[in-house]
Amino acid sequence: MSLMSDDSEVFVQAPTVANAELNIEAKPEANAQVNAEADSDANLGNNLGEQQTTDESAFGRNIGKFTAFVKEITGSGTEVEEQEKRNNHTISVDPSSNHENTSFEPTTYKILGRTYTSTTDASARVQELLWLSYRCGFEPIPKSDDGPQPITFFPSIVFNRLTLVNLSNLRSLLDKDHFTSDAGWGCMIRTSQNLLANALLRLFHTTGGQPQNFAVTKTEADVIELFQDTLSAPFSLHNFIKAANSLSLNIKPGQWFGPSAASLSIKKLVNDYNLIQQERRSERDSGRDSGHKVPTPNLKLHSKSADSDSDSDSDAISKRNSIPYVYVSENCDLYDDEINAIFELEQRPILFLFPIRLGIEQVNKYYYSSILQILASKFSVGIAGGKPSSSFYFIGYEGEDDLIYFDPHLPQIVQTPVNLESYHTSEYSKLKIDQLDPSMMIGILIETIDEYQEFKMSCFESDNKILHFHPLVTTAPRESSINQSWEEVQGEEEFVNLNIVKNEEDFVDLGSASTQGQNHEPS
């Protein structure tokens, strides 16, 4: 391993495999540019602004190389990339620009229940949403003895010096016994985090059903804190893996999640977190009754103090402080009496998750209009999944058939303190609906029984063919019964569905003796 440093960056050449193409060396012209910049610094630093711009460009180029490298090792190689070039479009709009396309009729954008005819307004809305992507250098996750091995090599990566607080961060990236990055295997977890994070952000930014401004606030910082890549953060990558393991899904670090595993993990993590919050509130209330002051939870997802003396304020705060109840339906059946009972008992919003497969190799055209109706609903919090070999977070659509999504496959370095700007992007990609993979997890956030009835009526009016509503539970709905632990991924696919048995055997049955102890590693 060799280190080369200049005034602004540290270049790390990590160990490489015997593939010369992965060993990306600095170009001669880049070295000449660095030397020229060093000479410029010696001349009283007259061109500091230009120097900073060049540094940022160098950082961008190297991150671009790293991203391309990750795509190569995760199955998104040249063949897939060429297909994406034909089908996908990446949009980056400067919100300060007033340029609109006046040659044609205005394009309509539907983004999580809001409608826009201005590209600038649509881009601004996209930038308000939270975006979670691959991270590198996070708290180590021990590998499993019979699971995949951590990636122990990287091409030349540029680290901004601010992200390298000490050498332990660098060493962690080269750890052979622990995962310190989810690049190549964590995209379904990241898109699930995207869905949950934006559901929470919407919930805590609303008052009486009316959205407030989505400026970067302490509320947003608190929501992001819940998803940090540490075991102490309730909705971290670490705890998704831990939850899946405790549910007998037996997913090991480095193995891929499907929509069902993701939805069940969210359900467990959120409901466990709610139990902890309820216990804390009970302790606080008991302390008040006895005259003793009990510390309030560190997490405050509201603007008022949790120590308000007003009973009405306390009740309102308690409601706003509640993470939603999670309801998972793999067959997309909803029973009115059961939903009503949950609202009465829980007294908090419900996050509905539907891990489904809408076809075999492709989404059946029968469901196209229903997918668009769900994304356009004001109760939608997006769709996770939906692309062969990858998982994306779909947040809406443009025109009639271009789905809009966030891509989690851009690796970012973990920063301390947390860089809030790294959880936002003005860029999104587009995918034709006929290119959508049938495996996905749909998210719907409903705050009251009246909203449930409103959503139900909107589905009836649009003849939604995905969701099925019933007045009574005639047969008690079963909890998810998945007897598959993880998927046997064909080729280098990263994302397949857990629910449908295919001839290619997309998953392994835990009950099958022939598969016990089988290792599964990214190729």
Swiss-Prot record:
Keyword Transport attached: yes
Keyword terms: Autophagy, Cytoplasm, Hydrolase, Nucleus, Protease, Protein transport, Thiol protease, Transport
Biased composition (Polar residues): 89-104
Biased amino acid composition, Basic and acidic residues: 279-292
Top-level EC class: hydrolase
Keyword Aminoacyl-tRNA synthetase (UniProt): no
GO cellular component, one term: phagophore assembly site
Gene Ontology BP terms: aggrephagy; autophagosome assembly; mitophagy; piecemeal microautophagy of the nucleus; protein processing; protein transport
Subcellular location: Cytoplasm; Nucleus; Preautophagosomal structure
EC assignment: 3.4.22.-
Cysteine pairings via disulfide bonds: none
Matching Pfam families: Peptidase_C54 (PF03416)
Annotated catalysed reactions: [protein]-C-terminal L-amino acid-glycyl-phosphatidylethanolamide + H2O = [protein]-C-terminal L-amino acid-glycine + a 1,2-diacyl-sn-glycero-3-phosphoethanolamine
Region annotation Disordered: where it falls in the sequence: 77-104, 279-316
Listed GO MF terms: cysteine-type endopeptidase activity; protein-phosphatidylethanolamide deconjugating activity
InterPro entries: Papain-like_cys_pep_sf, Peptidase_C54, Peptidase_C54_cat
Catalytic residues, chain numbering: 187, 407, 409
Role according to the record: Cysteine protease that plays a key role in cytoplasm to vacuole transport (Cvt) and autophagy by mediating both proteolytic activation and delipidation of ATG8. Required for selective autophagic degradation of the nucleus (nucleophagy) as well as for mitophagy which contributes to regulate mitochondrial quantity and quality by eliminating the mitochondria to a basal level to fulfill cellular energy requirements and preventing excess ROS production. The protease activity is required for proteolytic activation of ATG8: cleaves the C-terminal amino acid of ATG8 to reveal a C-terminal glycine.
Similarity-based family: Belongs to the peptidase C54 family.
The protein, known as: Probable cysteine protease ATG4
Originating species: Lodderomyces elongisporus (strain ATCC 11503 / CBS 2605 / JCM 1781 / NBRC 1676 / NRRL YB-4239) (Yeast)
Gene this chain is encoded by: ATG4
